[in-house]
């Protein structure tokens, strides 16, 4: 599951215009930012907000004199609050992060019209990145999945220069594939100093990776069938791998 803290940070800091009832205002003073209202069961009025790294729901009783902060469940045991938070907060923010990845500097591995898209943040010296690259071969080679790799230089001091060498090659995507296929043994023309252009790409990728809440590679992102952004950090197990590759 994608870390929520970064998604909440994407929400616009817009002051809630409607005058809040006194009980809700008292809860708001505890550091909660009210985002919108919604109709809640039982004649109550709901308020959707955020607090630190969490989405929160507040329920105002029909008499307007009491407010409850927390989850609401129905008779089937379904968490109505969490469903609302996912739909109204996390899902839209996740789609925005997906768009940021689409607009970033990535290397294509596979057919550009492959139906399943998977983004991967990878370091040239990351052994698990190489294993994931190998794991993905059946899906990529069959045209079912396209991997979009965002190179970063975070593991070793020589990582940035090695990543820059790949980016500066005649065909970066092909060079990256050959590098991973060789287990990192492909000879590269590693520069003594990373150019400003390549450093910007790496810095932008690392910033995006950080904004997504990941601090290790591979950091893998894909969309679920519900069109919500999902995250898998590290080498995925077989069950997770199947989900990532669209075998739901």
Curated annotation (Swiss-Prot):
Organism superkingdom: Bacteria
Example of a GO cellular component annotation carried by this entry: periplasmic space
InterPro entries: DiS-bond_Isoase_DsbC/G, DiS-bond_isomerase_DsbC/G_N, DiS-bond_isomerase_DsbC/G_N_sf, Thiol:disulfide_interchange, Thioredoxin-like_fold, Thioredoxin-like_sf
A UniProt-annotated Pfam family: Thioredoxin_2
SUPFAM superfamilies the UniProt entry points to: DsbC/DsbG N-terminal domain-like (SSF54423), Thioredoxin-like (SSF52833)
Subcellular location: Periplasm
Keyword field: Chaperone, Disulfide bond, Periplasm, Redox-active center, Signal
Cysteine pairings via disulfide bonds: 126-129
Signal peptide feature range: 1-17
Subunit relationships: Homodimer.
Entry-linked PANTHER family: THIOL:DISULFIDE INTERCHANGE PROTEIN DSBC-RELATED, THIOL:DISULFIDE INTERCHANGE PROTEIN DSBG
Known function: Involved in disulfide bond formation. Functions probably as a disulfide isomerase with a narrower substrate specificity than DsbC. DsbG is maintained in a reduced state by DsbD. In vitro, displays chaperone activity in both redox states.
Protein family according to the UniProt entry: Belongs to the thioredoxin family. DsbC subfamily.
The name this protein goes by in its record: Thiol:disulfide interchange protein DsbG
Organism (species): Escherichia coli O157:H7
């Amino acid at each position: 599951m994608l870390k929520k803290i970064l998604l909440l940070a994407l929400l616009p800091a817009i002051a809630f215009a409607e005058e809040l009832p006194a009980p809700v205002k008292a809860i708001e003073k505890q550091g909660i930012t009210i985002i919108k209202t919604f109709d809640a069961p039982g004649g109550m009025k709901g308020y959707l907000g955020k607090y630190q790294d969490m989405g929160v729901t507040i329920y105002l009783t029909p008499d307007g004199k009491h407010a409850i902060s927390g989850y609401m469940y129905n008779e089937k045991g379904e968490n109505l609050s969490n469903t609302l938070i996912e739909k109204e907060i996390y899902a839209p923010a996740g789609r925005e992060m997906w768009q940021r990845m689409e607009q970033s500097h990535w290397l294509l591995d596979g057919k550009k019209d492959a139906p399943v898209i998977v983004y991967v943040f990878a370091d040239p010296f990351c052994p698990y990145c190489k294993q994931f690259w190998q794991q993905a071969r059946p899906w990529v080679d069959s045209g079912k999945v396209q991997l979009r790799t965002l190179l970063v230089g975070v593991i070793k001091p020589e990582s940035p220069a090695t990543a820059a060498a790949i980016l500066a090659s005649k065909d970066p995507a092909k060079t990256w594939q050959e590098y991973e296929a060789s287990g990192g043994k492909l000879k590269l023309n590693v520069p003594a100093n990373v150019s400003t252009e390549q450093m910007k790409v790496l810095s932008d990728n690392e910033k995006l990776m950080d904004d997504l809440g990941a601090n290790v590679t591979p950091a893998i992102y894909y969309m679920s069938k519900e069109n919500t952004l999902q995250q898998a950090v590290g080498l995925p197990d077989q069950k997770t791998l199947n989900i990532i590759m669209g075998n739901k």
